[in-house]
Regions:
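Acidic/His- and Gly-rich active-site-bordering loop/insert found
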Residues: 2-101, 114-127
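Membrane-interface loop-to-helix entry segments
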Residues: 103-105
Length: 156
């Protein structure tokens, strides 16, 4: 199993880095993660996932892998960034004035997108379901967890 994962990581490393850098460069604050959400949804759709999203979720969404014949495991990431000016000088520095992923949410999203891609690419067989949940506004109170719960993202 590990060698299969190692090979997949070697084959996809550059794409994963590209995704993380795009996310880092385009941060958006809570409930305004429109571009971020659409980017992540687009990637999930390209992998073959069906996106579940509704008005109550605002910019949040989720995608399921597997079947309903067993437990559901939810893996969650945060879509939002912080209203903090980035002072780094890297080529993927935030292009949005006064907003940055100083919180690491760009890495969280990349981890979830990478896992979703690995599972789809290698057609992992599971009894149950993995729900990839992309939560908006984690940094706000009350934040996006409340809207995702109200929208039924924890049901099923």
């Amino acid at each position: 199993m590990l060698s299969k994962l190692d090979k997949w990581l070697d084959d996809n490393f550059k794409e994963i880095i590209k995704i993380r850098r795009w996310l880092h460069q385009h941060p958006e604050v809570g409930f305004n993660e429109h571009e971020t959400s659409l980017y992540c949804q687009s990637l999930m759709k390209k992998m073959g996932y069906e996106v579940t999203q509704n008005e109550t979720m605002k910019t949040g969404f989720y995608c399921d892998y597997g079947n309903n014949e067993g437990p559901t495991l939810i893996v969650r990431c945060d879509l939002d960034a912080l209203p903090i000016q980035e002072v780094n000088s890297c080529d993927y520095k935030s292009v949005n004035e006064g907003v940055s992923h100083a919180c690491g949410h760009d890495s969280h999203m990349t981890n979830i997108l990478g896992l979703a891609s690995y599972m789809a690419d290698t057609k992992q067989k599971i009894n149950g379901r993995v729900r990839f949940l992309f939560q908006p506004a984690e940094e706000l109170a009350p934040g996006g967890a409340v809207v995702m719960i109200k929208a039924g993202a924890l049901e099923g």
